[in-house]
Amino acid sequence: MNRFRFRASGTTTRPARRTHAPLLLACTASAAALLLDAGNANALPSFARQTGLACSACHTTFPELTPFGRAFKMHGYTTLSVNDAINENESDKAPGVTINRTFPLSVMFQTSLTRTNQAQPGTQNSSVEFPQQLSLFLAGEITPHIGIFLQATYSGQDGSFTLDNTDIRYANDTQIDGKELLYGVTLNNNPTVEDPWHSTPAWSWPFASADSAPTPDATALVDGVLAQQVAGIGGYGFWNKHLYADVTIYRSAQINPPEPMTVRGVAPYWRLAWQQNFGINYLEVGTFGLFAELYPGPLSGPTDKYTDLAFDTQYERPLGADFLSAHLTYIWQGEQLTATSGSGASSNRYDTLNTVRLDAIYHWRSQLALYGGWFLTHGSTDALLYGPPAVTPGQPPPVTGSANGSPNSDGLKFEIAYYPWQNVRFSAMYTVYTQFNGRANNYNDTGRNASGNDTLYVLAWLNY
């Protein structure tokens, strides 16, 4: 389960990064259905269109989306985006429900090796997870206007199944003053999971990461903290293939006992983006944000208020048979910590947090991808909120906490990925920390340096 700035033990844990490949899995699920029922493919015009597309129609290399992949997602994982090209079979005039004809089930398997530059106290280095994740997906078109992407994941880290990223959509098209308006409704469980770009947190690079390596303590709320902890319903529109807008309202799941950091009432999320082609160059520029009041403990009394405001951009350019993309994300978070400071868990009543991510990806012949990125999280110094961890005599020293009460962390990531087939990915990623929880050296007063958390992560990722 994800946690966010719950300071009962004086530590903070960044949520494990979920992996994702929504349209590839819809594609592979449909392809499996086609192979199993090839003789009836022509009787299923909408699914025949889905299964007739190569995975490269939706993805540069999975899980990155092409322009068609973005349109397919905004059209609710249905074939509305290509309906004009579909010739309906005369025998297929029943009401538009296709879930009884095919069962769009897919499987994702990941196994990984993680090695840090310095072993974590009390553990062996070079940990292997088999599996790291095992996911089942129900992903595809239910009716001509309704589609689903539902992921249930088994985590090797905690040995349990949970409902992972889920997005159920209704979508349709209309015309306003001769301009196309795509509109829809989304029901999902993770702010930004509904977004079609890779410059927002849910689908940003890295697409998979180590869940057994140390990560910085501080994370913005919109940056995956509420993932799978909330349910939201919202509406979106895409006007003239340029302007995208989305408003979704989230509410915490009713769990007994309640989770720490439960949302009081509802938490509104908003998104606005503009996309434009300049010759062969593509550019998206946007903004998104989230406001939430959270109970840090019991569901009563004062709350903490979080305001997240973010800006993002995505750039793409084909280079012959190759492809280049780049992403930039900036998130500002304002924190009014009335409840936390009142309970003595924060030195300040008001803190801020700034997050920046910049990455570039080069795809060679859809078989090899090179990734490089820079990341930074800087914020207010708060000796109680980010302070040094408690050290228990006779126990290994923790790797969390900050000796100077600073959340500042920054560094670089590099990755190489090889795709021998469209549904198989082998990759190796290396993370370098130049600063971790406020310092480069002895960051939590236990003698551990930021460089000790540098991480090699080797992954095998299979989809079927």
Label the model's feature ranges.
Residues 99, 126-130, 160-162, 222-227, ...:
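Short sequence motifs at beta-strands and strand-loop junctions characteristic
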Residues 54, 424, 450-464:
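Outer-membrane beta-barrel "beta-signal"
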Residues 52-63:
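The canonical Cys-X-X-Cys-His
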Residues 280-414, 418, 430:
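Detector for outer-membrane/organellar transmembrane beta-barrel domains
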Residues 129-133, 163-167, 228-230, 265-269, ...:
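Transmembrane beta-barrel architecture of outer-membrane proteins
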Residues 66-67, 100-116, 121-255, 264-280, ...:
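Outer membrane beta-barrel
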Residues 121-123, 153-155, 218-221, 255-258, ...:
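Extracellular loop and loop/strand-boundary signature of outer-membrane beta-barrel proteins
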